């Protein structure tokens, strides 16, 4: 199956936890539980549908799909893209030509009268000139042109497809039209992905997203697919839906609960506002400093869909209740080693339900546009596969444990290392560019070009769990803990050939950039001065990075001035 086809890759909202990048792994998990191959009509349950990409995969596989999400925007999007087949368009809109004409009509509407403008009034600047906006006094979630586009299209949808008209055709026309607008509104937004904050100026400091942000909002023809089986979408709490007993048993249930503290109702409040279109006033009141009191103007009713999975004290119990309530032969769970519920607890809860297997993938964690001086930037997203008709086997759980441990060790090989720390935990063989350590009576040898980066061994899967744990601990204790430590290591290595000096100097700008945040301001200027002083000792090599260092400095000044 081609996972990059339009239905599985287009018109999918940008989303924290969006499973588009994990879709090959989820597809593999589905194939693993179907040893006789995919067959039409398999009952598939997706209670945390979100962007809907996994349910789209299930529909594409010709499964019977029951999807659910209690956020209004997700419910509308998934109802449109799951419940409507491509072949339904002529019966809903009379013809494909009529739908294209409707989209042309939406895209060429005049601006709404001032009293009917909502997004343009509260969530966008008063001027079309992006260089004259003031993020302190007005919200900058959209350009004025795109805010006006949202207003006029959304107002027109309510006018020609009134919400109180409950006929099938009217509701389907309405849902698909709103879904197309929601995708555009989620895409052409002046944010890093969520609506809790907007960039201070369009495109942020780097201006690297201006093309996306400034591109005009226009509704495109929907990417739909065909299925011979029904796809139904609910809007409910996942556990409540599973516990009602109204749903028959499923062949496969796919669970993707929230991993972290980010609540979807607050993160995507503007999408809910556009979906509901209740136009709750969001006054632009200023405080005594002349700055907006309520910068994001988040809907107060977001707490109605507040998820227990986003709280450390509640997440584990919520997950356990859900797993116990699900009636399915196979349960596929995607979660993260960086999630609120520790991996061991997730594994144990799953093992109480049945036999457990695992698939893993390295996945960059969500950082909301910022990097940390000291945090690792990689974690492991994994998929656990539960066979609820078998009891958990010790050997299966041992494989699960080892798989995660191997991945954790491999991720450490992506870090940079302190040569001094390495010498405390390994024997350094400088003549042969390697480090060695005796682990479980065997001498382990790891290649390293410079004692700053390490090459993973090709035999890592053959190590015992005990050996992996010891290796993990030694590598963890030897790794650079901060970007400052990395910069120091780089500078300590600037004593080799011209080629080597050039190689290390080129690492400096991106490493220095990680310190260009207010909380590291003092450290940034200390290291900036040290970096600039390198020009005196290495003038020709420094010329290779001079412009990049200046760009980092300029970016830092912009951040610090705000």
Task: Give the positions of each predicted feature.
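Conserved proline-anchored active-site loop of SAM-dependent methyltransferases
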Residues: 44-58, 67-72, 247-267, 334
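Class I S-adenosyl-L-methionine-dependent methyltransferase module
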Residues: 64, 68-220, 265-310, 317
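Flexible, glycine-/basic-rich loop-and-beta segments that form/coincide
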Residues: 90, 378-416
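Conserved acidic residues
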Residues: 237
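Conserved Class I SAM-dependent methyltransferase catalytic core
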Residues: 299-362
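Class I S-adenosyl-L-methionine
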Residues: 343-391
């Amino acid at each position: 199956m081609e996972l990059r086809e339009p239905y599985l890759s287009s018109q999918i909202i940008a989303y924290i936890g969006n499973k588009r990048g994990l879709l090959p792994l989820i597809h593999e998990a589905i194939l693993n539980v179907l040893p006789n191959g995919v067959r039409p009509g398999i009952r598939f349950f997706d209670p945390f549908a979100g962007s809907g990409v996994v349910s789209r995969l299930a529909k594409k596989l010709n499964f019977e799909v029951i999807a659910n999400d209690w956020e209004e925007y997700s419910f509308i999007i998934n109802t449109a893209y799951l419940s409507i087949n491509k072949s339904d368009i002529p019966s809903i809109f009379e013809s494909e030509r009529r739908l294209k004409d409707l989209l042309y009509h939406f895209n060429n509407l005049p601006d709404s009268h001032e009293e009917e403008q909502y997004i343009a009034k509260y969530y966008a600047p008063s001027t079309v000139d992006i260089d004259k906006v003031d993020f302190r006094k007005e919200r900058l979630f959209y350009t004025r042109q795109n805010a006006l586009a949202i207003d006029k299209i959304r107002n027109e949808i309510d006018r020609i497809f009134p919400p109180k008209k409950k006929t099938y055709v009217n509701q389907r026309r309405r849902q698909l039209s709103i879904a197309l607008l929601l995708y555009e509104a989620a895409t052409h937004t002046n944010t890093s992905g969520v609506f809790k904050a907007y960039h201070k100026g369009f495109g942020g400091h780097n201006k690297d997203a201006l093309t996306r942000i400034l591109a005009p909002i226009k509704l495109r023809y929907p990417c739909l697919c065909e299925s011979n089986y029904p796809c139904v979408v609910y809007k409910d709490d996942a556990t409540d839906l599973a516990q009602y007993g109204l749903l028959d048993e499923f062949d496969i249930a796919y669970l993707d609960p929230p991993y972290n503290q980010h609540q979807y109702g607050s993160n995507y409040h503007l999408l809910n506002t556009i979906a509901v279109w209740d136009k709750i006033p969001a006054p632009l009141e200023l405080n005594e400093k002349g700055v907006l009191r309520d910068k994001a103007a988040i809907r107060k009713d977001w707490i109605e869909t507040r998820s227990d999975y986003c709280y450390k004290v509640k997440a584990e119990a919520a997950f356990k209740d859900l797993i116990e309530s699900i009636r399915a032969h196979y349960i596929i769970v995607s979660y993260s080693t960086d999630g609120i519920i520790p991996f061991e607890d997730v594994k144990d809860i799953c093992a109480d339900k049945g036999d457990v297997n695992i698939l893993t993938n390295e996945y960059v964690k969500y950082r909301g546009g910022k990097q940390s001086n000291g945090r690792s930037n990689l974690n492991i997203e994994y998929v656990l596969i539960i066979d609820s008709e078998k009891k958990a086997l010790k050997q299966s759980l041992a494989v699960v444990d080892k798989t995660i441990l191997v991945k954790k060790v491999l991720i450490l090989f992506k870090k940079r290392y302190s040569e001094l720390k390495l010498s405390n935990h390994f024997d350094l063989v400088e003549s042969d560019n390697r480090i060695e350590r005796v682990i479980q009576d065997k001498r382990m040898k790891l290649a390293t070009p410079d004692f700053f980066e390490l090459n993973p061994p090709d035999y890592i899967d053959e190590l015992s769990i005990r050996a992996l744990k010891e290796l993990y601990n030694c590598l963890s204790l030897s790794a650079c803990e901060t970007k400052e430590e990395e910069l120091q290591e780089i500078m300590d290595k600037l004593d080799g050939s011209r080629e080597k000096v050039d190689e290390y100097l080129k690492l400096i700008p991106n490493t220095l950039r990680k310190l260009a945040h207010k909380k590291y301001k003092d450290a940034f200027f200390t290291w900036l001065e040290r970096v600039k002083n390198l020009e005196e000792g290495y003038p020709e090599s420094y010329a290779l990075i001079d412009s990049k260092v200046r760009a980092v400095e300029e970016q830092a000044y912009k951040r610090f001035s705000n």
